[in-house]
């Protein structure tokens, strides 16, 4: 990849990163465990729609699974994101030691809120870069 292409991609990421940080924060604030991420998937679907992706929901019969697609030709680039919270990992944000919001509650102690939003930002940047460069 050329330096120019790399700079273009980073500029695309930088232009949208605040919106995706806000997405990660909203998901963090609503910790939902595996197969129960109903609000989190709504947040991701809303972002996919805003970014112009075609959306398939209820993938493999899972109401919290979603696919976003862009373009009509190959090659196909797949990026996996996840946004489930984990039981017992409730945690105040920005605190390095264990400090649960709710003792024994669910939380994003492993950063899955970040995995989902970062994967979606990466997919958006690639989509936008391909649209710009052909």
Q: Where are the predicted features?
A:
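Acidic/His- and Gly-rich active-site-bordering loop/insert found
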Residues: 3-108, 113, 117-134
């Amino acid at each position: 990849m050329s330096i120019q292409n790399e700079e273009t991609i980073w500029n695309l990421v930088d232009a949208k990163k605040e919106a995706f940080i806000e997405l990660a924060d909203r998901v963090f604030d609503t910790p939902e465990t595996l197969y129960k991420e109903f609000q989190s998937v709504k947040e991701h679907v809303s972002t996919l729609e805003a970014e112009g992706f075609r959306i398939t929901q209820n993938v493999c019969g899972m109401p919290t699974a979603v696919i976003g697609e862009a373009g009509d030709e190959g090659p196909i680039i797949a990026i996996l994101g996840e946004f489930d919270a984990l039981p017992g990992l409730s945690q105040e944000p920005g605190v390095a030691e264990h400090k649960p919001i709710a003792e024994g509650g669910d939380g994003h102690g492993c950063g899955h809120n970040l995995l989902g939003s970062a994967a979606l930002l990466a997919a958006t940047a690639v989509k936008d870069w391909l649209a710009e460069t052909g």
